[in-house]
Amino acid sequence: MRRRRGTPLGVSWTNCVLLLATGLLVVLISVHAKNPRPHRGLPAPAPAPVPASVDQVATENAHRREPTVDGSVLQRLSGSDRAVDEDEDVDEDEDEGLKHQHLEHRQQFDAYLGTIRRLRRPYRSKYTIEQLMRLHVTPKVSGDIDMDPCKAGGFMGDIALPEGDSGPVVAHTPIDDEEQERQEVEQLLADSPSPVHDPPSVSGAANSGPTKFNATFQLDLEKLKQEVYHEGLQVEEEGLTDIIRKKTKLPSSGPVNLKAGQSQSQSQSANEPVKPGSESPSDYAQASSYKNEVLPPSEQRIHTDKPARLTLAEIGPKFSNKTQSLHRNVDTRKIQSDNKDIEDDSGNNFVAERRPSQIVPTSLPEQRSTPAHVYSNAGGNGMQLDDEVDFLHSRGVVRRRHRRGPKQRRSNQHLEHEVKLQRLREELSRPVIEAHHHQSHHQKQAQHRQHHQSHHRKKHRRQQQHHRRRGQSTTQYVNHSPPGFNQSQQAQQQSVPEMDLLKAETSKDEEPLRHRVARAVTAKKERIWDYGVIPYEIDGNFSGIHKALFKLAMRHWENSTCIKFVERDPEIHPNYIVFTVRSCGCCSFVGKRGNGPQAISIGRNCDKFGIVVHELGHVVGFWHEHTRPDREKHVVIEHNNIMKGQDYNFNMLSPDEVDSLGMAYDYDSIMHYARNTFSKGTYLDTILPIEMKGRKRPEIGQRLRLSQGDIAQANLLYKCPKCGRTFQESSGIFASPSHYTAGALSNETEHCEWRITATYGERVELKLENMNIFKSNNCETDYLEIRDGYFEKSPLIGRFCGKVDKEVIRTESSRMLLTYVNTHRIEGFRGFKAEFDVVCGGELSVDDAVGRLESPNYPLDYLPNKECVWKITVPESYQVALKFQSFEVENHDSCVYDYVEVRDGPGQDAPLIGVFCGYKPPPNMKSSGNSMYVKFVSDTSVQKAGFSAVFMKEVDECETQNHGCEHECINTLGGYECSCRIGFELHSDKKHCEDACGGVIEYPNGTITSPSFPEMYPLLKECIWEIVAPPKHRISLNFTHFDLEGTAHQQSDCGYDSVTVYSKLGENRLKRIGTFCGSSIPPTATSESNALRLEFHSDKSIQRSGFAAVFFTDIDECAVNNGGCQHECRNTIGSYICMCHNGYSMHENGHDCKEGECKYEISAPFGTIFSPNYPDSYPPNADCVWHFITTPGHRIKLIFNEFDVESHQECTYDNVAVYDGESESSSVLGRFCGDKIPFPISSTSNQMYMVLKTDKNKQKNGFTASHSTACGGYLRATSQVQQFYSHARFGNQDYDDGMDCEWTIAAPDNSYVQLIFLTFDIESSENCTFDYVQVFSDIDDVYGQYGPMYGQYCGNVLPQDINSMTHSLLVRFKTDGSVPMKGFSASYVAVPNSGEYDHSDEDVENSYSSEMVTPFPGSLKSIYIEDTQEETDEYSDFSGNQLVFNGQYRGRYSLPKRYYSGKA
């Protein structure tokens, strides 16, 4: 046999290498075999670790190495492969042997590499457990707080403080009793705020003991309250839904939860709003792809008594399992608004048409000629319960209504008046001492006496004021006289200048009841916007209809003042406002802050015309009217009726904070509070105008339009010229003040300003006629200056003087500014007359900025018979990009009436891109060249709100320039975005990529840290970690550092940045353990399975140092044979405990259960229950169960009448627990003990489960309770057909009078609800106005309003079957006080969306999106489609999802009707 040269003893070099590799592999495998755990762990921490600095830890980490394969071994192994291939002298037998050995070792090597890859974990931690346990991190905070009005220090605008520390998050029940609510709130909140100008006192906060606030919270609260006092924070109640609910005695969305038997003031910081074991229906979540599926509630909960973090040495075999839970309260009673007696805004809105008008000059800017003052009332009206109310409707009809209060209030009206009058005398007689304003007690008395000196003078003054108020017209005077007509008398008759009214009111002939005082506007001149120009931006999250609403409110301010709201240009507008949504609801800063963008938040319940106008008033520089220093002469504050903790909203401002503009107190101001703002109840007054004998108390708190005082005040604040006005019409005629009165010579200088505003895409054409102005050198002294824009720095078109006639001037933009100065009026120079027209169409171009295009008259309805053609061009080598932001054009299948036509080129013969109409915004589009043709056409009838669009130059930046993206570049319309590959995520610079946070961790112990820890975490970050332990194990998470955004006075639900911990119960089932924020260390969290999920979220402002946590696993003894427990086994750290079902008691052996004799099944709709032996003591070791069940679609209400159960801070000994469902596995509504009667409790479904458990010591008398039923609730539609009924005794008796019930029926995503009425017998009436059933498309998730209505039904004919357009429906049943009938029954089922028809809003011809929810003046549109055969045919393919009941085809309901009434 031939042998290779140089190979001794017959052993080849290849075999040697393979033998060495095999030995190395054996050694590595033996090392791994020493660890019996299936997952590689980290070394245990050393006891009593010494804190280490971040730099020390970083140095240690620099020397850490990940396990790798020796490079020389790889080289030798790969080299052996080549050695075999290169040897040409090996014989065939040896070749076969070597190849076999090589293949065998190659397989072993591949297996080894596979082992290395499997052991390489997808998540890389920065720290070991030892390092993390001894790491000390200093908390950090970023400096971007000013943009968010809810978070900004020194905030100046509308926002409210919290009512105090909310206490531990434990059992809670709805508050239905007003007295109990009052007592609870008084115990929860601080005793009283500091005086306005006193320094904060926090000495008692830190040493207050367990019944006082947390010291840190008290410091924060006092600091913020001082900002309120010194900075003048102002509050709007409309956006604070929790306060509205409390006023109407509804449960709060963020309830204050109390342990039974515990003092309410024993509180927990809001930094820990949700504790482990605090369960609610929202605690059960889905994995991201199944987040809307139904999750069955789990009975297992986690609770800890240790609020601070655990050290490793403290983790012992025992761990508390006591459970306290949150409760999501459901009540079908609606929230009553402050203005419930004012007509609903959906019926009082109408479009202000543009029409040519000839305008008479006035000394103050006048109101527009269109009736633009009839708008929705979104604020409180402040009317007295028995006041008469006049309503102006869209046709100009005045209808009078009487507000009616409770009978008791009517009967005691005289007594109440005497009480309030006496209280008023005490208020006026009490001395008031303020910084910068001291007034003696005798001066107060003297002023009080002056108020009652002369009865005939008061009567005369009241008559004058009455006539002046009636003379304030809500519409502008329109003159149709010929040009030669002398109009001086007419101008005098039209209106009296506001300043003249003020002078007359404060003349020497009257007592000083309303002297010249400080008006509620800012005294800080730096907060006044330069040139009266307020730039704005609108968040892209708002719908087109909301953007139109904001523009309409801004136009309302422009129409009456010289203030201009303009789209922000980054090059010239460093300071600007941003319309956005913040958690504070309706809030804004007062005036200009001067540090860049400032937010104006239009949140839930704030998207009403009057409220937006009000918030813009704060932007302009207005404070609330009732905060004036002289307010005690005009209103009385009822402090006893103010919600506890909201008194600071009624503090007076000092004269240093407001300017003296000589304006009288304005009860009619849109900036005035309503009478019951922040009251404890809807019918309690917090602020009342002073009532003078024989004079009706004025109304306050209107949110309809700017008052005459608001207009005059704004014009004074911004030094608006006394003559001139703002035009928003499509055409008009105006003239200088002396044009028609040349004979009335005067040496007074005329200074006027006219502002003509059109929409984007329109231009202004002005024709000067009969101009006769003194001709000075370069027109320096007397002139008419015309600018192409909105302020004095806009491009100058020309300055004119002398004589000019028939001069035509055109703008390139959509605005024109005219400034007129006449100093030679005495010499008979008449000035000028002008006529303007607004024309649409023309050539538009854009270079670097973004261009805008709107339909004529937007946001109001476009005009009839319009044809506008725009040619849009951009520089060469670019394309034109067009994006519609809102779109509402008369609909037609072929778009033959009104339409928008877009072509790919400069002319009408260019290739057609599309013709669009209807309500769905067209898709984004771009041209192939550098030009685009856009044409808008309207016919003679049916005008809609029109469209708003932006255009820009477009190029593929990813191809043509150095985009700077580290991984991938994605081209977008008008720009580009960077993207990262899988496993990475985008850095905050939006270009570079970094390792993605989160991941799956399969280790028995380890660490988790927030991104960039210990540095500040990034903005807008979403991280998810999943820790997976071996089967039959549990995972515990212990936080070692915690510093997230969130303080007690900013939030209570971790709405900004948060960490949420879930127990993963299955592949797609999650149960929330807790949600945490702030700086308090969360308690240890333990999973209920072998998987635990951690989610981290950060918002777009304010960063902190983040968090760090250690996790470890523990075996679950309950996983094997249920731990030997007969009923329930609950795992604890290092051990387990056995528990019995309700109605059973534990056997002496600690594992078995024996049956009890205290079980009750209750199905009666009404009744009373008692504890065993009541009124004697209940027995020891009792385990009693009451199971309530009622008619489907109704809920159980439980009211305790007497209650006396052994007391304990955590109700450990004896307790009564109430569950929201059929067993104790349902969510907990409350756990009670002690002798305080619990609050009334309501279930969310038709079942309730109550348990009484007692121990062997100390028995009490027990309880008695009444149970009843309530209609309405939340129904979950599934694939199984379910039913619900109109009233609890359906089939046995008629429904009750005065019912108002709501059912929300929700189906899973990608499904719709099919609602079928099985029986129907409702009192019949015309238009169904007495008793009726309404069906809506659910309630808007953001703003809490009804969606589009499918129909309103009555009579005894079955309504058509209804299929929801979305995945939910809302059914409302309302009855009056007479003629009850049998009621109705209905079935509902969830039907998956078929491929034939998509129920999304995008595919519906008449879009029922959220944009149609909020009506406002000028865009109120009918959301109902006529049930024509043509429309029915269009949806005829619905037959794929038909249902059959009782052998009858029920069909499908696809088109909504407004009313349906019929009889068999």
Curated annotation (Swiss-Prot):
It is found in: Secreted; Perikaryon; Cell projection, Axon. Keywords: Cell projection, Developmental protein, Disulfide bond, EGF-like domain, Glycoprotein, Hydrolase, Metal-binding, Metalloprotease, Neurogenesis, Protease, Repeat, Secreted, Signal, Zinc, Zymogen. Binds 1 zinc ion per subunit. It is an enzyme of class 3 (hydrolase). The keyword Zinc applies. Its cofactor is Zn(2+). Its EC number is 3.4.24.-. Its main location: secreted. Residues 519-721 form the Peptidase M12A domain. InterPro entries: BMP_1/tolloid-like (IPR015446), CUB_dom (IPR000859), EGF-like_Ca-bd_dom (IPR001881), EGF-like_dom (IPR000742), EGF-type_Asp/Asn_hydroxyl_site (IPR000152), EGF_Ca-bd_CS (IPR018097), MetalloPept_cat_dom_sf (IPR024079), Peptidase_M12A (IPR001506). Residues 954-994, 1114-1154 form the EGF-like domain. Residues 328-340 have a biased composition (Basic and acidic residues). Residues 40-99, 179-210, 248-349, 362-382, 396-419, 434-497 are annotated as: Disordered. This is Protein tolkin. It comes from Drosophila melanogaster (Fruit fly).
